[in-house]
């Protein structure tokens, strides 16, 4: 069995969901998208009142889709709060380092984004005239 790539911690009715794949700069793999969807479902069913979405490591919040193991089942949109997972609790994204492509979409579907001085947002799809449907 593969080690979890999403962690869920709860304290004082505040959930912290962490993308935990720093060795791959938190690239969004199929496993990660599945676990993230499950974490948001857990949040919805819990007594937690708010969620902080963050990422492990110091180089990237996430570099977007993992090109060697892209999200396919479920698709990337299925882990987006309020789109693929219905939530009535606020999600606060805490961003550091690179935030690229699908990760940028994930941040945009959060209720609030807080970025530190290292944050670098980039949506490469726009450079080639493609929008994956999440931002459009």
Language-model-derived ranges and their functions:
Residues 7-8, 83-85:
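Short secondary-structure boundary/capping segments
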Residues 74-78:
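Active-site-proximal gating segment of KS-fold condensing enzymes and close homologs
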Residues 12-20, 31-72, 85-94, 112, ...:
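A structural preference for short, pocket-lining loop segments at secondary-structure junctions
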Residues 29-30, 127:
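Short, solvent-exposed loop/turn segments at secondary-structure boundaries
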Residues 25, 29, 103:
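Glycine-rich acyl-CoA binding loop
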Residues 80, 84, 100-136:
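CoA-thioester-processing core
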């Amino acid at each position: 069995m593969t080690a979890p790539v999403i962690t869920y911690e709860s304290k004082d009715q505040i959930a912290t969901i962490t993308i935990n794949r720093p060795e791959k700069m938190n690239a969004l793999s199929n496993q990660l998208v599945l676990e993230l969807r499950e974490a948001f479902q857990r949040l919805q069913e819990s007594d937690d009142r708010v969620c902080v979405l963050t990422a492990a490591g110091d180089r990237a919040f996430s570099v977007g889709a993992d090109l060697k193991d892209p999200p396919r089942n479920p698709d990337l949109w299925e882990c987006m709060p309020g789109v693929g997972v219905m939530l009535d609790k606020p999600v606060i994204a805490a961003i550091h380092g690179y935030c690229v492509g699908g990760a940028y979409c994930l941040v945009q579907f959060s209720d609030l984004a807080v970025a530190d001085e290292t944050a670098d947002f980039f949506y490469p799809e726009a450079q080639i005239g493609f929008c994956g449907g999440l931002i459009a």
